[in-house]
Amino acid sequence: MEEHSSIVFPLEFKELMRLKKEIDKNPEKWEEVKRVINPLEFASCDIAVAKVQPISRAFFKMIELSEKLNPLPETPVRTLHLAEAPGGFVQAWNWIRKPLGLTDETTAISLEKTTFDITWKRLLEVSRFWFSRPTLQTGDLMKKETRDTIIEEYTREKIKAWLITGDGGFDFSEDYQNQETKALPLILSQMLIGLRCLDKGGCMILKIFDCFTLPTIQILWVFCKVFGEFRIVKPDTSRVCNAEKYIIAKDFKGVDKNLDIFLTKIDGIINEYEKDASFHIETLFDTGPISKWDTIDEHFKTSFEISIKRFINTQINWIQKGIDMMNSDKIIENTKIKTANVVKWCRKYHIPINREYFESHRLCHVNRAEEASSLSYHSLRQSQSQSQNQNHRIFYQKPVLKSDQQEPTPPAFLLRHRSFDDS
């Protein structure tokens, strides 16, 4: 088993790798424990607190992430969702846009699982009654032919996407230690397609994992340079023990000469990996200040170190808690506290409450006002947009870190735009 090294946070990296080795000793038991200690696990289960029936947990993540995109366009837009199956992000986007009466042109692409119908089975069922159904496609984003076909479609028509999401990942349950290096080629593929197909002023959401290696840090640097606003968040509904985080980038500046050269190089790197899966990606830049950690600009490094270190420490604390529970052979779940967590989350994001859950668990039910449907969703989102706009103005006055979530989730990583060739 190949183990990667860290160029930042050596102590935290060593501790996290130690804990992940403990997890690898008993992955089956860990699968149970990680769900038990997750504060918002009850949002999505057989009988869930939330009344919405999501295709996957990604639905709830996208509900949270979309709040960071406010204000949303009040006219139909084009959206592209990469590595999307089974379709949670698309379902959430439809949920968000439906009250506005807008019919966006939505396309979802994912790796085919046996057949097209199996890959998109749940989204095909859910979207049957949507006014505007998404265009569903299959394809391997790691193959140049697939990438070129997608990019050609968006560049040929001159109608690029306002929103692009990349939620790709793998089953890391057999090897938690090498998430970052294994996920890197897919992350690069999604970034390449996204930046080629995104319209000026558009937004991108991209899932990443650990941030210990130079290529991952360089990806963050690129997003910082080519977007007007950039942050990293971990949604509350993302399981606390995993490493997944999301880049949320707004106000895309477009593809200039420097970015075009960079994306062409990334295409070549992915092609090399496709030929030889053992190909090790050491850097995305051969020259310039960004080619080495020591020469990256201090503003970026400071913001990165403060924010990412908090993500890591939070993850370490939760994993240690899970391992302690796993070793004690006493897997205890506090249903009432976890239910209260989910109810609070549903209130925050205006998700209706499921009465059946409270009845089946013999818990006190919330009042009927809290189980109301999304009829007032539009007005609620408008009021929240105004509030968030005020926060954005404050951010531009002082472009440092901003806390998007309460503990135990660390603050988001926010940076203001600088030009791509600005070191």
Q: Which residues does each predicted region cover?
A:
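Class I S-adenosyl-L-methionine
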Residues: 218-273
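Gly-rich Lys/Arg/Thr-decorated short loops/hinges at beta-loop-alpha junctions or inter-strand turns
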Residues: 43-46, 166-179
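Conserved Class I SAM-dependent methyltransferase catalytic core
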Residues: 177-232
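A short acidic (Asp/Glu
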Residues: 88-94, 117-120, 175-177, 214-220, ...
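Intrinsically disordered, low-complexity glycine/charged-rich regulatory or linker segments
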Residues: 1-156, 281-423
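Beta-strand cores of modular interaction/reader domains in eukaryotic scaffold and signaling proteins
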Residues: 78-83, 107-108, 165, 203-207, ...
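Active-site cores of enzymes that catalyze phosphoryl transfer or operate on phosphate-rich substrates
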Residues: 147-173
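Conserved beta-strand elements of beta-rich interaction domains across eukaryotes
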Residues: 84-89, 111-114, 169-171, 210-211, ...
